[in-house]
């Protein structure tokens, strides 16, 4: 299966001289078409930094990244949103724009279609993420956290990109909201044939969505495999993250519903 993302011999260093510190050293990663990959790792391992490199927002110190066969460094220009969609952790909606104009932003900026058609496309995406037409004129301040995530997801998908990047997509959602958002992502992944790279700390989200998991530790990807295989890999971080109490809770079967009480 052809690679959508190819990261080769990547190194990332912040600071200079005595203050310099490295986040990535000789990191390699291949993301195949159709994969739904979760990036996990401890604090400071550079998960979001790697996501920003893939998006082309920042440049590594050395090494190279290709996205859909082109250097990631080219993604910062016009038309990038037609190749990669990005859902930021807190949504990052434009507070001065209503929901519809937030979703249609890339279409307006690139002038690829008339404004009326841009709004029609945005309305289709609005409904695709489970929102209603009456939400189109709301302002971001009037939305719940779950609705903000859905609007941001619609905006990320407005140009029909084949690659979707997600930074902590269920952060800040209650359990029901998190489950509903995972269901939506799973449906869109299948329906649109997306390749997805997701940073998450949430094991429930990871197990609900991931076809593969890549673990960042020791400044590189130490394992890239299906979740069950990763959970068996011998490493202190994996032992704590996957086989600690949180990991065991995520894997535990849901308790059976109590039978209805009998009438006396």
Language model region names:
Residues 116-134:
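Conserved ABC ATPase "signature" region
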Residues 71-85, 109, 116, 230-233:
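ABC ATPase NBD coupling module
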Residues 55:
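Helix-to-loop junction immediately C-terminal to a conserved catalytic motif
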Residues 164-167:
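Catalytic Walker B motif of ABC-type/P-loop ATPase nucleotide-binding domains
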């Amino acid at each position: 299966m052809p690679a959508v993302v190819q990261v080769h011999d990547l190194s990332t260093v912040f600071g200079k001289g005595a203050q310099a510190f490295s986040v990535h050293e000789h990191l390699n990663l291949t993301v195949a078409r159709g994969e739904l990959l979760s990036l996990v790792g401890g604090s400071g391992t550079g998960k979001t930094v790697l996501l920003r490199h893939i998006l082309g927002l920042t440049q590594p110190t050395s090494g190279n990244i290709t996205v859909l066969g082109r250097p990631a460094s080219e993604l910062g220009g016009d038309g990038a949103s037609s190749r990669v969609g990005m859902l930021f952790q807190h949504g990052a909606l434009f507070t001065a724009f209503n929901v519809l104009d937030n979703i249609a932003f890339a279409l307006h900026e690139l002038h690829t279609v008339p404004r009326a058609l841009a709004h029609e496309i945005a309305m289709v995406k609005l409904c695709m993420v489970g929102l209603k037409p009456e939400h189109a004129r709301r302002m971001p301040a009037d939305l719940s956290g779950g609705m903000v995530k859905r609007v941001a997801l619609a905006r990320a998908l407005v140009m029909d990109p084949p690659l979707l990047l997600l930074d902590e997509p269920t952060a800040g959602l209650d359990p029901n909201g998190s489950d509903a958002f995972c269901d939506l992502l799973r449906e869109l992944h299948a329906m649109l044939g997306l390749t997805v790279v997701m940073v998450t700390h949430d094991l429930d989200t990871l197990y609900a969505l991931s076809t593969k998991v890549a673990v960042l530790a020791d400044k590189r990807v130490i394992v890239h495999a299906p979740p069950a295989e990763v959970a068996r890999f011998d490493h202190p971080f994996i032992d704590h993250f996957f086989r600690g109490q949180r990991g065991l809770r995520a894997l535990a079967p849901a308790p059976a519903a109590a039978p209805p009480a009998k009438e006396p």
